[in-house]
């Protein structure tokens, strides 16, 4: 069968040819083991190769396919790929094929009155999905998938955040954690019923804006502009009292106000520990995805630090060349992705035994990279959000080596729908502040345009075998 295909392809043109050895990790699309290398014209591109493989498979209905050569998606002709990578046409190329990706198309936008700083999604099999947003107006909002606001948090005068909220996360189906410029971390009780979002605990300890939080079980990590990482418990019995010098100043007016509103019954607690070591604002703090006793933090001081959360001890410091603004753990690859002020994402090996700091660089953004999220379906997928007004999707298998080491370019770029067809210089007016990637809801991003934007695709990044 391979010989017939080779003859058929050769008869189409007399141009330069190359031998391709096709393989796939998708058992449903695998060619017979007897299929050997196939001689094809080097002028062929993805569509023609897809047609060829479908003919070899004798599929009833053509399956659109993508092709990876040496880990890089084929976006040109075979000849152009060979030339760009300095590969001889005499070489037999190993070509992996995967089902063609469905781009993440825009499906909905939810509008706010102010900048939207953060977003998270609650999705489970028992209830309808919920989206929670944090805004610079100091409020949390819970949305249903029909773009309706079903719950709003208390305002400042009723016991809520006293200024802009910077981050929000669902701790569980019944609890929410938020943080903000008012230097607090707050735990909220959540229900879909009438009361919605009600304050549970106010945490005091930071002396600067709390810009990012991460949650795991009954633990919270916070990253603050005061150069520290906060470590907190959601259990009142485990949480220490707040030292008086860390409580907000209580003028007669504010004292009277607290007595008149719901915050009078809200517990106030201190941190289990404040982790010190950074020499500039801390941009992100996250838990190790496989060992919640380990934490990581990134900072404007250019470093990634590893913490033992049991002893509150600094374990290791990895120093880069640029300010690091966000972090995401990729445990299957023993890597940690960090967005930078230098417009790229650096994949860092956080292990103390690692001989190099940067394992890979993801390039393409034109402004600071401030948020990251993992693909829920593929261990190779990652999305980044940037102040350039875009979110970019990466397949970390798709790489090449140049003078900067191992680098990768994004496979998709999601622009802000609010920008229309125009391109904003430096992302002006459409900066992305946060992004979440949920298996059911899709890619949810928020930002300076005061919009929750939802994009959805299918198999955006092929799964691992």
UniProtKB/Swiss-Prot annotation:
Region (Disordered): 235-272
Primary location: nucleus
Keyword field: Nucleus, Repeat, Ribosome biogenesis, rRNA processing, WD repeat
Single GO cellular component term: preribosome, large subunit precursor
UniProt region (Ubiquitin-like (UBL) domain), positions on chain: 18-99
Repeat region (WD), residues: 111-153, 160-198, 205-242, 277-317, 319-358, 364-404, 427-465
GO terms for MF: ribonucleoprotein complex binding
Gene Ontology terms describing biological process: maturation of 5.8S rRNA from tricistronic rRNA transcript (SSU-rRNA, 5.8S rRNA, LSU-rRNA); maturation of LSU-rRNA from tricistronic rRNA transcript (SSU-rRNA, 5.8S rRNA, LSU-rRNA)
Name of this protein: Ribosome biogenesis protein YTM1
Function: Component of the NOP7 complex, which is required for maturation of the 25S and 5.8S ribosomal RNAs and formation of the 60S ribosome.
Subunit text: Component of the NOP7 complex, composed of ERB1, NOP7 and YTM1. The complex is held together by ERB1, which interacts with NOP7 via its N-terminal domain and with YTM1 via a high-affinity interaction between the seven-bladed beta-propeller domains of the 2 proteins. The NOP7 complex associates with the 66S pre-ribosome. Interacts (via UBL domain) with MDN1 (via VWFA/MIDAS domain).
Protein localization: Nucleus, Nucleolus; Nucleus, Nucleoplasm
Family note: Belongs to the WD repeat WDR12/YTM1 family.
């Amino acid at each position: 069968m391979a010989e017939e295909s080779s003859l058929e392809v050769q008869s189409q043109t007399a141009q330069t040819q190359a031998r391709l050895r096709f393989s796939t990790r998708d058992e449903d699309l695998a060619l017979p083991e007897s299929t050997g290398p196939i001689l094809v014209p080097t002028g062929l591109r993805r569509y023609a190769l897809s047609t060829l493989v479908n003919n070899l498979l004798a599929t009833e209905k053509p399956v659109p396919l993508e092709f990876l050569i040496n880990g890089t998606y084929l976006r040109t002709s075979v000849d152009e790929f060979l030339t760009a990578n300095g590969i001889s046409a005499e070489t037999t190329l190993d070509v992996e094929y995967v089902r063609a990706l469905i781009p993440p198309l825009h499906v909905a936008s939810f509008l706010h009155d102010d900048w939207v700083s953060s977003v998270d999604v609650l999705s489970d099999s028992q209830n309808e999905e919920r989206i929670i947003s944090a805004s610079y107006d100091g409020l949390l909002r819970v949305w249903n998938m029909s773009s309706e606001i079903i719950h709003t948090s208390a305002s400042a005068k009723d016991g809520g955040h006293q200024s802009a909220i910077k981050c929000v996360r669902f701790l569980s189906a019944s609890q929410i954690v938020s943080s903000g410029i008012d230097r607090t971390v707050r735990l909220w009780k959540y229900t879909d019923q009438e009361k919605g979002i009600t304050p549970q605990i106010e945490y005091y300890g930071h002396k600067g804006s709390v810009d990012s939080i991460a949650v795991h079980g009954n633990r919270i990590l916070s990253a603050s502009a005061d150069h520290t990482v906060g470590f907190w418990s959601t259990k009142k019995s485990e949480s220490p009292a707040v030292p008086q010098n860390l409580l907000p100043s209580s003028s007669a007016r504010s004292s009277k106000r607290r007595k008149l509103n719901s915050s009078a019954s809200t517990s106030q607690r201190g941190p289990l520990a404040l982790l010190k070591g950074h020499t500039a604002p801390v941009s992100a703090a996250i838990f190790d995805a496989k060992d919640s006793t380990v934490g990581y933090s990134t900072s404007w001081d250019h470093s990634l630090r590893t913490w033992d959360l049991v002893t509150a001890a600094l374990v290791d410091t990895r120093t880069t060349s640029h300010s690091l603004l966000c972090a995401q753990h990729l445990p299957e690859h023993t890597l940690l992705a960090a967005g930078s002020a230098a417009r790229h994402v650096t994949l860092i090996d956080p292990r103390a035994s690692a001989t190099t700091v940067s394992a890979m660089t993801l390039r393409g953004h034109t402004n600071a990279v401030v948020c990251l999220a993992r693909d829920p379906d593929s261990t190779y997928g990652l999305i980044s959000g940037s102040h350039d007004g875009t979110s970019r999707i990466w397949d970390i298998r798709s790489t090449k080596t140049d003078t900067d080491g191992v680098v990768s370019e994004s496979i998709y770029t999601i622009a802000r729908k609010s920008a229309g067809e125009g391109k904003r210089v430096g992302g002006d007016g459409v900066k992305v502040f946060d992004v979440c990637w949920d298996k059911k809801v899709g890619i949810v991003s928020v930002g300076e345009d005061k919009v929750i934007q939802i994009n959805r695709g299918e198999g955006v990044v092929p799964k691992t075998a």
